[in-house]
Structure formats: C-alpha cells, structure tokens
Design a protein with these regions (language model features):
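N-terminal hydrophobic/helix-forming segments and targeting peptides
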Residues: 2-310
Length: 310
C-alpha cells in the first residue's frame, strides 16, 4: 500500500505503508519499489513514459495496433495503441467473444514542469539562457538550484528528406536556475514571489555567440546517439531534475522522486495489468495533458478512449 503526499515541485514525496515490522521490506516489496524508481528515472517526459510502458507491454506479449489499420482482435488477446506518443491504451480482451464488462484504470503521463519556448535563446550579461514556460500547477521555488537536464521529442528531416521524430534525453546536468546570493537579496527568506518570465530563464553557460541555436545543439546530440539528422524542424522539450529517486528516512519510509504525480499511478496500473491472471476484460489508459485541463486529442476530454472502445 502507498499513501501519497504530493507537492507539485521538482521533487515529490510519497509515504510508504509497506513495511511489515516497521523496518524491513519483503524482497517482493523492494523489487517493486526498484521497478517503480527505474520507471520514473526512465520517464522524464510523457513521451519517454509511454515508450517505457510500450517496452514492458512488448515483453509481456502485447501486440501494437495502429489507428490507420483495420484491427483484427481475438478473444483473450492483448493489445495496445498510442496517440501522439504521449497517451497509451493497453487492454486485454475476455476469453469469451462477448464483452459484457471491462475493468478500467486511468492515469496520466504528464507532470508539472518547465517547457522550452519555441524561440528560447537569450543572452544576458554574458550568459546563455533558454526561455521556459511553466506547464501545469507547479511549485516554482523548488526548481531553483537544481541540476537540470533536458528531454523530450524532436522532429527532424533526415538525409532522405523524410520527417522523423526521435526521443531525446541529455541524461546529464546541462543547466540550472541559480538563486541570487543572500547579500544581494536580503529579503530572500521572507515573502518572495517568482516571475516565470524574468526569474526562470534557465542558465546554460557563458554566452555562446549570436549564432547560438538550440536546434543545432539538439541535432548534435541526436547525431552523437546514432540518428541521421539533416535539420531539426520542431521540438517539445522540458527540463527535469537529474537527482534519482531515493528511499529516505531512518526506516526508508519515504519515497522522494520527481513526477510521482502521476507516474506512480501509471506504473501501478501497468504492473496490475501485466500481473493479472483473470480472463475478464481489462483496460489501462494513461492520458497526456491532465495538468492543463485535458482539452486535447490525447487528453481525457478527447475521443481516444471512446474510439478504442468502439
């Protein structure tokens, strides 16, 4: 059992109700927690979360369906389908042909974060920065003085002039949002509001010249990872704290990690689906854009779930 205390910050805390004797966890409980922490680490963005779930579903024998193809599904079959690479539906059909009921679990893949603006390059006082926009209901103060990396999806044109998309994750600290030194801001420990437009531009390093382009940095990173990139067309990127999930407390009764809202529910729903041995119909849906109202094609207010059920 997990009792959750969520703060919409760079790092959240969950209270664990797992320990049998208040100190030691069973091997199964520890294995489950290790899997959860690995899933969170591998999922810095909704695109990576869906890719992580796809990997586990493929290993479990699930077959991928495509919206552009005619579906041929069988009783007892196990399938999944994605939309925008950020929303996923996975389901197991009952052994009997007639579907009388379906057990469903819902979650969402997105979390509050700092997203990179379309034209983010800023040079100020000899330093290179990137402009960001707050996504979702985030606490802003905890984003300061963190080691930040960058991840998301990049759309490119390859050598054959085809548009392709790639996941990208720098997996190392490349930026930070430094706090102002106390002797320059004597009121820092009192009431202090954060202006996202002036206080949150992310620091990349010393100024890199007027011709600096984030798209060039993305292209170089993708090429270093074996992708053919002729031109970066567009991107959807967000910064994340590189600090790994950890069990903290004298008895390790707390799980501290980013994106617990709502990757925790995604992981619980996925593992429940994969571990189930029932012959009844089951479905897991993990939507995107919950943090901004779900009003999108891949959000919960969209038609994705209904179209899959139909």
């Amino acid at each position: 059992m997990l009792y959750i205390i969520v703060t919409f910050a760079a790092r959240n805390v969950a209270v664990l109700g797992l320990c049998n004797d208040g100190i030691r966890k069973t091997m199964a409980q520890q294995t489950y927690l290790n899997g959860l922490m690995s899933f969170i680490s591998d999922s810095p963005t909704p695109f990576h979360a869906v890719a992580s779930m796809e990997s586990q579903l493929n290993m479990a024998g699930y077959s991928q369906l495509h919206v552009s193809n005619t579906w041929h599904v069988e009783a007892g079959g196990r399938y999944y389908i994605t939309r925008n690479d950020s929303t996923i539906v996975a389901f197991q059909l009952p052994q009997e042909n007639a579907i009388q009921r379906m057990h469903m679990v819902g979650a969402h893949t997105d979390s509050p974060c700092l997203k990179v603006k379309p034209n983010p390059e800023i040079q100020c006082q000899g330093y290179q920065q990137l402009g960001v926009e707050v996504y979702g209901g985030a606490l802003l103060h905890p984003w300061f003085d963190r080691d930040l990396s960058l991840a998301g999806r990049v759309v490119c044109r390859d050598a054959s002039n085809q548009l392709v998309s790639h996941l990208i994750d720098f997996k190392r600290p490349i930026a930070c949002i430094p706090s102002l030194a106390i002797h320059l801001d004597r009121e820092a420990n009192k009431e202090h509001s954060v202006n996202p437009q002036t206080d949150l531009p992310v620091l990349l390093g010393q100024a890199l010249g007027d011709d600096f382009s984030l798209r060039s940095v993305l292209a170089d990173e993708l090429k270093a990872n074996g992708h053919q990139v002729d031109q970066v067309i567009d991107y959807e990127l967000s910064f994340y704290d590189v600090q790994a999930p950890a069990l903290v407390g004298l008895k390790e009764e707390f799980l501290a990690a980013a994106r617990l809202d709502n990757l925790l529910s995604c992981y619980i729903g996925l593992t429940a689906l994969l571990a189930s041995q029932t012959d009844q119909g089951m479905l897991l849906i993990c939507h995107d854009h919950e943090e901004v109202g779900s009003q999108s094609a891949e959000g919960a207010q969209g038609s994705f779930l209904m179209s899959v059920l139909q």
